[in-house]
Each structure stands twice: as C-alpha cells, then as structure tokens.
Amino acid sequence: MQTTTALRLYGKRDLRLETFTLPAMQDDEILARVVTDSLCLSSWKEANQGADHKKVPDDVATRPIIIGHEFCGEILAVGKKWQHKFQPGQRYVIQANLQLPDRPDCPGYSFPWIGGEATHVVIPNEVMAQDCLLTWEGDTWFEGSLVEPLSCVIGAFNANYHLQEGSYNHVMGIRPQGHTLILGGTGPMGLLAIDYALHGPINPSLLVVTDTNKPKLSYARRHYPSEPQTLIHYLDGHEASRDTLLALSGGHGFDDIFVFVPNEQLITLASSLLAPDGCLNFFAGPQDKQFSAPINFYDVHYAFTHYVGTSGGNTDDMRAAVALMQAKKVQTAKVVTHILGLNAAGETTLDLPAVGGGKKLVYTGKAFPLTPLGEIADPELAAIVARHHGIWSQEAEAYLLAHAEDITHD
C-alpha cells in the first residue's frame, strides 16, 4: 500500500495537509508520483467556493478531494488494462479537463485520490479513457507542470473565429497578421498568451498588452520584446484609454481581444475596440454567477463582432503545448517567479492573489517556504538562478531536488 502526503479540500477555505494510505491500485488504474505542481488561480477560486464550485462534490466535507491540476510526475505501476500504452518510469502530464459526458469531474477538483498537491496519486480509469494522460519527454519536471496552463491559452486562441469572406463560414483561430489586444495581460496566463502570440503557429502583426501593475509590465517588456513578424506595445492600464488603444491600431480596431480580468469596464472597453468581424474572448473566469457587462449589440448586428469564452483546453491543445515546449519554441520557464514545498502550498493557495508575481511552482516531495526567485537563501542555488538571468531552469531544478529537505510523511 502506498502512503501519500496531500493537500485536501474539505470546504470553503478549508485546506489540510494530511498523510494517508492510498487504496490499492485496480487493474484499470495507474499509480504515480507527483514531482511538481504549479498553482493556479482556479484553485484559489475552488478553495474559496468549496462545495459550491461546480466541479467539487457536494460531500467534500466527508470525502475530501486532493487539490491541484497542473502537475507532472512519474508513473510507478500500471494496471493490466493500460499496460499496452503506459509503462513504469515514464514521465506524464494530465489534461485535467476530462470532458466526461455525464459529470464535470476533473483531477484537482473532484477526486479523492488524484490531484497535483500530493506526493503520490492513483490515476483513475476516467483519465486514460478520455485520453487525458500524456507522456512528457521534456528536460524538466517543472515545464511539464506548465503544459496545462499553456494548453488553456492555446484553447483560447483556437476558439476565436472570423468569417470567411462572403459567407457565414467560420475560420477558427486569431486573424493571421491581424491586430491583437490583451487586456490585463501580465499575470502568468497573460505572459503565456504573449509568448504564444509571438511564437505560436499564427502571429498578429500588432500585439498590444495592458495591465495596471507596473512591475509586471516591466517584466513582460523585458522578457517578451517585439519579433520581426509582430510589433508589440505595453501600456499601463490607467493610461490605456479607448482613444489611445484605437490610435495604436491605426483606427482599425482589434481583430482579436482577450480579456484576462473579470472586470465589467474592461469588457465594455474591449467591446468598443473590436474591428469589423472582430472576436472578443473572455478568458478570465468570474466567481460571481451573475457577472455581466454592457457590450455593443449594434456592432454584433452590423459589424459581425463575435464573443467567446473558454475555460481550459482540450487534449489536442495539450498535445500542441507539449510539442511547442519540447521544441523549445515557447519558453514557459519565464512565467515562474516563486518556488515552494508542499508544506507551504495550502497557505499560498488561499493567499494567491495577494502574493503577486507569476507562477508559483510546488515541489511536492520537498519542504521549504514560499520563496521568490530573487530571494533564494541558498548561495549555490541563487548563483544558478543568476547565471540563467533570473529564470528557473533545469540546472536549478536538479540542484533543488538534490538538496532541499524532503517532506515528511507523519
């Protein structure tokens, strides 16, 4: 029997780090260890809502679930049903958005024996049956934990659409060499969107990014400059008026707009900036079920503007993310700003918006406090990070895994 230490959700803002024995692996299941999990704002929302969250079971108070859905690890044992496809020793990542036909269940939200904030998990049959367990052959564990968030961005870009000229047929994806606007776009997901817009398969000719956080804007400006095919502008959100943004587009407006903050004023602003046949993607998931905002329906009718919303990617998006990352076309390491051990994951999850910065990377088998990359106390690890220009790296990860204190199972 396998013992695990895991962060479990019991109710609203009730996260508990506990050690317990996992049930024996069945013939249609897989036993695995988790090495890394990156914290997601969706987990903060989940922890705040508890059983009110649509993916969290009603009986979570008596049947707690393991939180965390952006994880990477190693397969330890494979049940007979899946031995033709998976083997012990393989690294894996999971597409948490299972898209089950009869229920909204997802790893990290709904299951008692699987989630990213754990040392060991039992992967249920549903994950493999939905083709949501993918092998990972990247150089690092931590980049495997960033596949899922990148897949969400890929899904959003794929969901946008425009009309085929002279018809009502939809051409999926952002407009090639069009004008793209990202509002509230310097958080970790926004940075991934910038990277994907610059280095993905379809690139805009103009990319404008706004945010009200000046340090985050400076970070984005430093790490994501213009490319030959894409001119990029970064604007302080306080100064990004409609007139200013419209002028940057040459008066044309924007073909694709992504809203990364659930804010009524931003949505209304975005609506007013859509070009004819433009598409607005509401990426940010609100907690308020009554959330709404005024939009321009005159333009919906006469200018063929479109509105979409996406919540996560699918397995195809995940495979695309894996391919981009393994080919090193998208540099997801740039979004990591903090590291922590499993012991600090609960407090950090509950306080996530206030922490600031980019992605917080949990090494689930280790015990150490939440640490910004610029404040690492270990001089050798700090020197490694400095050598990589402040970016988390394979070298840094290997050092941490070899030298950080192990989490205790007690």
UniProtKB/Swiss-Prot annotation:
Cofactors that this protein relies on: Zn(2+)
InterPro entries reported in the protein's UniProt record: ADH-like_N, GroES-like_sf, NAD(P)-bd_dom_sf, Zn_alcohol_dh
The keyword Electron transport is annotated on this UniProt entry: no
Binding site for NAD(+): R221, G309, T310
Binding positions (Zn(2+)): C40, H69, E70
Keyword NAD assigned: yes
The entry's keywords: Metal-binding, NAD, Oxidoreductase, Zinc
CDD domains reported for this sequence: sorbose_phosphate_red
Single GO term (MF): metal ion binding
EC number: 1.1.1.-
One Pfam family here: ADH_N
Protein family: Belongs to the zinc-containing alcohol dehydrogenase family.
PANTHER family in alphabetical order: L-THREONINE 3-DEHYDROGENASE
Function: Reduces L-sorbose 1-phosphate to D-glucitol 6-phosphate.
Name of the protein described by the UniProt record: L-sorbose 1-phosphate reductase
Organism listed in the record: Klebsiella pneumoniae
Lineage: Bacteria, Pseudomonadati, Pseudomonadota, Gammaproteobacteria, Enterobacterales
